[in-house]
C-alpha cells in the first residue's frame, strides 16, 4: 500500500515537473499579454483625482547610484504637465511611471550644472515623439539656457531627420522638434517672480543660493489651492523659504556633510586628491538634511521630501544616519525621495498621499 502511494506521488510530481517544464512558454506568453494589457499605452494619470501630482523620476546626484537617477521631478496639474530638470536616466524612469508626455507644457531648469541637464536631449526627444508636439518644447531657465538648448537641438538634429524619414511627419512632425529657450531674468532686487500663469496653474521662479552658480532657481507650483515648492540646489535660502510659505509639499536638496567628508578623507588616503577636493568643495553649496528641515519648518511646509541625495543612500538602514537631526527639526512628515515615488495632492483637500509608480 505504502509503495503504491509512493508510486502515485512520484508520478504526480513527475507530471507536474513536465507540465512546468514544457508549459513555461505558455506561462511566459500569458504573463507578457497581461503586462501588455496593464501597462502599454495606458495613461496612469487618467485615474488621478484633479489636483497636483508630483513624480520623482530622479532623486540622485552626480555620484554613481544604482537606485537613483540624476535629479529630475515632474508635476501634473490638472491637464498640464511640467518637468523640472532632466538628470541622467530620469526620463526613462518617467516613461516607466506612465507620465503623460502629451500633456507636457514645458521644462524648467533650476540651473545649468551638468547633472541637471544631461538628460535634456532625451526629454526633448520624448516630448516631440511621445508627446506628439507640433512646436518646440519651451525650456525655462537662467541666463545661458539658450546656449544649452541650442546645443542639444544641434546634437539631435541629424537624428531628427532619420526619424522623420523613417516614421513620417504624422509621427515625427518636423515643426515639433527640439526646444525653445525661455530665459528667466528676475528684476533687480526681486527674489521671486511668476513666470507661468495659465489655466489655473501658476509657477514662480525663486532665487536660491548655489554660488558660484548664478543665477540658480527654485520653483513654486500652485494649482487649485494646492502647492509644491522645489528647491533645486541651494544652501538654506531665506528667499526660498519666504516664497514657499504654507506649501503643502516641499522638495529640498540634501547633502550629509559628515558622510561626504568621510568620503573625501578616504579618497585622499587612496591617492585621489582631485576627487577628494571635490568632496570638500561641494559641502559649501548644498543644504544639509538639518538645513532642509529648517527650511521646511520656517516655511510652514506640511510635508518635506529630501532629494538630490548626496552621498547615495543605498539601504534604508542608512537613512537615519543620513537624516541626522532633521526629524527633530521638522515637525511634519519627512521622507527621503525614492525614484518612482508619486505624491498626490488632491484639489479641495489637505491630503498628501504617497504611492509608487514603478
Where are these regions (language model features)?
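Cap/insert and terminal regions of metallo-dependent hydrolase folds
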Residues: 2-17, 217-218, 224-229, 235-339
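Short, solvent-exposed mixed-charge patches
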Residues: 357-358
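Binuclear metal-dependent hydrolase catalytic cores
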Residues: 2-228, 316-353
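Residue-level structural signal for beta-strand termini and adjacent loop
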Residues: 87, 233-234
